[in-house]
């Protein structure tokens, strides 16, 4: 049986150089190859003209360049594009491109599904399947860059920012997320600024400490409630890592980080008459007073079967004003792509359909059982 080929999109620069050393090649050859991959989007070794023919043949015999494919895409009226990315085994994840006047952000998934079961999030309600590999994470950027056109073709960078805010909890997939972000930041990779790569977490505190020791990127933290009692319901991982512990971990990360410029972004979804009262705004302000942050209020994006409603503009405005009275910088996130279910909390991919099929199957089995009894 032939040996499985190495997918070069799985390798950060350290691993790529180790592979080339194993082949008896100098480190700069690995750097050249990475540049072909990520600056020019080349996947055919024969097109890598500054790499000699013998090495190209060695690479072709031992390695491959395989990224997940785009299955389909939908374009919103506001220009947002939601991509369904086929990661094999009949599974898909969703990746969202958000163009703005001064930037173009790609929202990337880290897992097929999510295990955290946040009650306001469509992805969290669909269950967890598996972690994505490095090539499946960076491959989302690579494929969308091909779709939009690399800088060599268009004259401008197609993606300026990456946010790890798609499907999944990134800190539960650190083994693949860290090398993937290394490739995003690497000068021979996607060459993004560390301030333009953001990881969002719901609070896996031990993994947050490991992240801070391994890499420096911007951090967004999903708080969503001003106290443990409510957060236990909205974000069930809070039962394991409560707010005091999470906030202490955030402060440790800030102390290690330059990317965050001394503060993180707090994400707070606005749920009608659940977490959006002025009393809760005062409570949130007091909770966050010792943690340097700006606060991003996110109008809830309903999904089929969701138990919550979106806060009214007037309630969001009152909540925001209370926080500003305490001196916080407050941003109300503009909802993008909600007409194609691409907004925050709406991503579910193929898992939604699979969950529906499983639920239908269980219901049918129960009906059969009742009939037999």
Curated annotation (Swiss-Prot):
Tell me which Pfam families the record gives. Answer: Radical_SAM, RlmN_N
Record-annotated disulphide pairs: 107-344
Which residues, by range, are in coiled-coil regions? none
Kindly list the positions annotated as binding [4Fe-4S] cluster.
Answer: 114, 118, 121
InterPro entries in the cross-refs: Aldolase_TIM (IPR013785), Methyltransferase_A (IPR040072), RlmN_N (IPR048641), RNA_MTrfase_RlmN (IPR027492), rRNA_lsu_MTrfase_RlmN/Cfr (IPR004383), rSAM (IPR007197)
Q: Which family does it belong to?
A: Belongs to the radical SAM superfamily. RlmN family.
Name used for this protein in its record: Dual-specificity RNA methyltransferase RlmN
Q: What is the originating organism of this protein?
A: Shewanella baltica (strain OS155 / ATCC BAA-1091)
Q: Gene of origin? A: rlmN
